[in-house]
Amino acid sequence: QSVLLKGYANEGHDSAHPDYADIGKRIGGADDMNTLMTEGAKYGAKFGIHVNAGEMYPEAKAFKDDNVRRYADGSLRYGWNWLDQAVGLDSIYDLATGEREARFDALEKLVGTNLDFVYVDIWGNNTGSSNDDSWQTRKLSKEINDNGWRMANEWGVANEYDATFQHWATDLTYGGYNQKGENSEVMRFLR
């Protein structure tokens, strides 16, 4: 049974993204999260976390002017408005500088392979780079897989190569038929 810890970070769901290693202290921190995962594994549970690689929140330590997304007129490209207003994260900058990979590596030092998968929210809707293309997606998957974790995504079309779970593709009440992933028989044949 896969269990998604959607609100593991900072103060809960969508809080302080993309500080992946900021495991909520008021919910027990890394020690309690590791206990949950090791004890849960005894019952067949495999745990994953919900992260964001396309938006960031002002309270995040990773938040800085160099990696925010802006429109041509200089205004910020805003994303989801949850605990605070998200701002688009320049995912190409994040990849090229190695900052995203370093944040995943910092998380790995805390949880290791007690963690089974990483669910990357919103990847594929172009909030991050305005082009979450296959090359970037494969690099993101590699950063996650190199730490021993499986890759999961929200959108069915976001990561057809490496995702082991896609939320919208499996949730009939989420989105229309065109949001259910790649349905091409030609593509299946070629792969």
Describe the predicted segments one by one.
Residues L83, S91-D116, W123-R191:
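Active-site-proximal substrate-binding groove within the catalytic cores of carbohydrate-active enzymes
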Residues Q1-G128:
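Aromatic-lined carbohydrate-binding/catalytic grooves of carbohydrate-active enzymes
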